[in-house]
Amino acid sequence: MRRRLLLLAALLLANLAIAAVGMLRADDVGTGKAFTAKVGLVFDLGGRGDKSFNDSAYRGLERALRELPIHGEYLEPGDGADRESAIRLLAARGFDLVIGVGIMFTDDVLLVARDYPDVLFACVDMIVLPDQKLPPNVIALKFREEEGSYLVGAAAGLATQSKTVGFIGGMDMPLIRKFEAGYRAGVKAVCPECKILSAYAGVTPEAFKDPVKGKELALAQFGRGADVLYHASGSTGLGAFEAARLAPPGTRRLVIGVDSDQTHEAPGHVLSSMVKRVDVAVFDTLKAVSEQPHRRDIAGVRVFGLAQDGVDYVADARNANLIDAKMRERIEALRRDIVAGRIQVPSQVAPAEVAP
């Protein structure tokens, strides 16, 4: 009885917390078919409109709403403390699948999944320890970010004229170090003599939503001679694009976007973007659940790399003047080698590689 009262109290708090910031949204599907599943998406810091990670997840939900017979809703918690409340709210309302978008949902998903064994939960970028056994109703959606970062690193190494490139991370944590590790390896694969600068915006989740800090770090690296920067920092990276747009006439400043195609952020200054296909992972998971809401065979760890179309880089007509046919041919050869297993991309940065 006491446990039920505690869960009821938590649910009431969830309603109050989310209603207080007015962040509840719902989208019904106009497929003409009866709903086969109810699915919910809970965003992390930055929410919709971050032009990066969360927006990519939302594109996956949007596609599912267009193509699948599902009912879908999304929530934008007011702050990090509301993560558990938000996923608990959807679970208590009888949703078949609840997805937490971001690594910070790891503990919350594991906690709530125990209380709702009949609900499937998924977590994007979930932390899974080597010997950890996940609950049978939990899906960990993980990516080989280092593989996509390797390709944009190669693009940076081929495009740089100063032989100095930079990396800007959001929160200094193992996940973002994967981006840096792949980027460094890609740069060095095509430009062994290149110097790589590195900086992080902070050590807390707020480091992913500080464009002012991002601009400051970008200007510092441009000032030290870098002419190409890669950011893996959420909306903090918007400051890097601003720094590139402020380039004096005749000065070369290029930025590589992350998670989503960010070409539009600074046309003419965006070399490419490392596209982390959170939308693919979300859509594939929603599709599986729509076909059989109570299935459990999709639980466990699901990994998306180059071979699974989980990561990629942008190369099209908009940046053809920056990534020409010869450069693209070299990058595509590297892609084939990674998919075939001939190149093993590192996921950790060696201490000796870290530039001051």
Regions found by a protein language model. Give the residues of each.
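Short, Lys/Arg-rich N-terminal segment immediately upstream of the first membrane anchor
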Residues: 1-2
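A residue-level marker of the well-folded mature domains of exported/periplasmic proteins
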Residues: 5-8, 20-356
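Core hydrophobic alpha-helical transmembrane segments of single-pass membrane proteins
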Residues: 10-18
